C-alpha cells in the first residue's frame, strides 16, 4: 500500500497553482487578511495592473472587475501555458530575477502572490507616482517542519547580494527594508504562521512536487526512505503538522 500511495502521488499533475486536489488530503489555514479580497478591492479602482509571477493566473482570473490594462509575468513554462489560457495573451515570459519588460511608470497597481524573487527596483520603476504594490510573500521558515524532516536541519536562509532584491523565505524586516530602499513607502505589513496538516504521504509527495523549493531536487526515489518513515507515522499517529509563514505588504511609490 505504501508503494501505491507513492505511485499515486507521483502521477498527479502539478502544473499551475490550483490546489483543489488537496481537498480531503491536506489542509492549510488561510491568512486573516484575505489577499484575494484585497486584490479585488484595489483592482476595481486601478487603471493599469501588473501581476508579477502570476503562476497559472488563477488568482488574477478570479478578480471580478479588472482595470482596462492588465499584464502579467511568469517564468516557469508549464505555468505559462496555463496562465495564458486563464488570462489571454497578456502574460510575458520573464525570468524571476530579470528586468520587467514594461516602460517606466506604466502601472498604478503591481501585485504578486508568493513571488520567488522580487526586484524592488523594478517594481518601483514600473509604478506610477502614487502607484501601489500589494503582495503576499512567503516568510522565513515556511514549511520548515517538513523540509527538516526530509533533509535534516536547515541553517540560515537565502539572502540576496543585491539590497534591492528579496527571495521567497525572506524575513519581514528584510522585506520591508528592501521595499523602502527602492523608494517605496510601506503602508501595511502583516505576518502570520499558519497550521498545515497532511493526512497521507500521497499529499506530501504531491506538495513537494508542486512547491519545488520546499525540498530542492525532490524525487520520490531519492527520498523514499524518509517517505516510508513518514507514511508509517501518519498511519499510526495521524496527520503530519507543519506551519507556513505568510506576509502581506502594501506600499506606495
Residue ranges of model-derived segments:
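N-terminal auxiliary segments of SAM/dcSAM-dependent transferases
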Residues: 1-10
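Conserved alpha-helix/loop element of class I SAM-dependent methyltransferases that forms part
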Residues: 14-48, 58-62
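Short beta->alpha connector loops
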Residues: 33, 54-57, 113-119
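Class I SAM-dependent methyltransferase SAM/SAH-binding core
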Residues: 47-100
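A short acidic, Gly/Pro-enriched loop at the edge of an enzyme's catalytic core
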Residues: 98-109
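A short SAM/SAH-binding and catalytic strip from SAM-dependent methyltransferases
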Residues: 107-122, 136-139
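Conserved catalytic/acceptor-binding region of the Class I
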Residues: 120, 130-195, 215-220
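Conserved Class I S-adenosyl-L-methionine
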Residues: 182-253
Amino acid at each position: 500500500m505504501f508503494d501505491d500511495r507513492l505511485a499515486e502521488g507521483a502521477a498527479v499533475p502539478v502544473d499551475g497553482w490550483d490546489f483543489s486536489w488537496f481537498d480531503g488530503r491536506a489542509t492549510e489555514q488561510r491568512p486573516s487578511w484575505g489577499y484575494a479580497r484585497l486584490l479585488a478591492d484595489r483592482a476595481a479602482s486601478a487603471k493599469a495592473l501588473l501581476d508579477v509571477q502570476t503562476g497559472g493566473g488563477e488568482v488574477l482570473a478570479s478578480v471580478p472587475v479588472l482595470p482596462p490594462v492588465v499584464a502579467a509575468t511568469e517564468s516557469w513554462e508549464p505555468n505559462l501555458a496555463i496562465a495564458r489560457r486563464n488570462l489571454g495573451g497578456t502574460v510575458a515570459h520573464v525570468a524571476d530575477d530579470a528586468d520587467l519588460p514594461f516602460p517606466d511608470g506604466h502601472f498604478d497597481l503591481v501585485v504578486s502572490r508568493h513571488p520567488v524573487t522580487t526586484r524592488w527596483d523594478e517594481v518601483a520603476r514600473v509604478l506610477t507616482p502614487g502607484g501601489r504594490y500589494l503582495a503576499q510573500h512567503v516568510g522565513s521558515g515556511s514549511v520548515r517542519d517538513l523540509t527538516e524532516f526530509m533533509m535534516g536541519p536547515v541553517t540560515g536562509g537565502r539572502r540576496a547580494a543585491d539590497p534591492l532584491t528579496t527571495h521567497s523565505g525572506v524575513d519581514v524586516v528584510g522585506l520591508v527594508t528592501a521595499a523602502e530602499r527602492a523608494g517605496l513607502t510601506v503602508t501595511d505589513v502583516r505576518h502570520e504562521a499558519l497550521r498545515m496538516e497532511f493526512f497521507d504521504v500521497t499529499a506530501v509527495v504531491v506538495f513537494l512536487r508542486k512547491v519545488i523549493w520546499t525540498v530542492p531536487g525532490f524525487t520520490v526515489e531519492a527520498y523514499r526512505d524518509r517517505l516510508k518513515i513518514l507514511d508509517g507515522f501518519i498511519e499510526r499517529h495521524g496527520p503530519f503538522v507543519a506551519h507556513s509563514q505568510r506576509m502581506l505588504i502594501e506600499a506606495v511609490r
